[in-house]
Regions:
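Conserved alpha/beta cores of soluble small-molecule-handling proteins
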Residues: 1-172, 176-179, 207, 216-283
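Glycine- and Gly-Pro-enriched alpha-helical subdomains that act as flexible
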Residues: 172, 179-202, 208
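Secondary-structure junction motif
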Residues: 211-212
Length: 283
């Protein structure tokens, strides 16, 4: 089946879809993005992702490309045209097309929007949930506004490639004080030696993960002990469990860090319970 993309008001075959070479997203990374998981034909955490998109746009002073209902209609149509039941939707909004200049355009420009959707093999996620993943740790090298979901991801790309070359699935960044911030495309968690679920608190240091928020809500509803505080790699290795979360990988166990097993090297009960509750929940 030929995949279809939405670009600035037009649905086109993915291979033919294009943006201007003067698009500020292309030239400066002056753009934001969002990713929704689709499971069983449903968008998970739909409204929370829309809210984060709006926040990122406000932080960069980029205008909303269209109304919320209109944007939802575009997303739904993109999913329909690509016949996606299990997969992801990717949406990107740039400041628009303008002559190259680092400062914002002096005249009003229209934001550029791209929406794509693709199917993913659910069996791959199920296997990952069942077996867990290995990760590595690396020094934090990203900019200071990680709370904005910007397309500026070069440091993430380099770290993820280093993880891949090390035979790992993900990399956790570690700040100058020795605390884990997050992964290249996921939030970081542990269940510490006292049985408390821990994840770094919200600030400009990390992306305000939508799946992170959903898992915190589930944990509180189940009266699990939760604390939002940073932790070190040493604490993660001494923990009962460690895991990552993202739209595509909700509550996936980390079974080894830098080739050292976490606990017994298997997904733990808290991670499994949170993942099952999240995947069984409503969007």
């Amino acid at each position: 089946m030929t995949r279809t993309a939405y670009v600035n008001g037009v649905y086109a075959p993915l291979r033919a879809a294009a943006v201007s070479i003067q698009d500020r997203g292309y030239q400066f990374g002056d753009a934001v993005y969002e990713v929704w998981a689709i499971r069983g034909g449903r968008l998970f955490d739909r409204e929370a992702h829309f809210a984060r998109l709006s926040r990122s746009l406000r932080e960069l002073r980029i205008a909303e490309p269209m109304s919320g209902p209109a944007l939802m209609a575009v997303i739904a149509e993109t999913i329909r045209r690509n016949r996606v039941s299990d997969g992801i939707v990717y949406l990107q909004v740039s400041r628009g097309i303008a002559p190259r200049d680092h400062a914002f355009p002096s005249t009003l420009v229209r934001p550029c929007i791209v929406v794509t959707a693709k199917s993913l093999d659910r069996a791959i996620l199920n296997e990952r949930l069942a077996t867990g993943v290995n990760i590595i740790s690396l020094p934090e090298t990203r900019w200071a506004r990680r709370d904005i979901k910007s397309i500026n991801l070069l440091a993430n790309v380099l770290a993820r490639q280093e993880a891949k070359e090390a035979g790992a699935f993900e990399a956790w960044f570690v700040d100058d004080d020795g605390f884990v911030t997050e992964g290249t495309s996921s939030n970081a968690w542990i269940v510490d030696a006292s049985g408390r679920i821990r994840t770094r608190g919200l600030s400009n240091d990390i992306l305000h993960g939508v799946t992170r928020a959903a898992l915190l809500r589930i944990a509180h509803e189940r009266q699990m002990q939760v604390i939002e505080s940073p932790f070190t790699i040493a604490e993660a290795l001494a923990a009962r469990e460690a895991f990552i979360s993202s739209a595509g990988n909700p509550a996936v166990a980390v079974i080894a860090i830098d080739d050292t097993p976490v606990c017994d090297g298997r997904p733990g009960p808290v991670t499994r319970a949170l993942g099952a509750a999240y995947l069984g929940g409503a969007p």
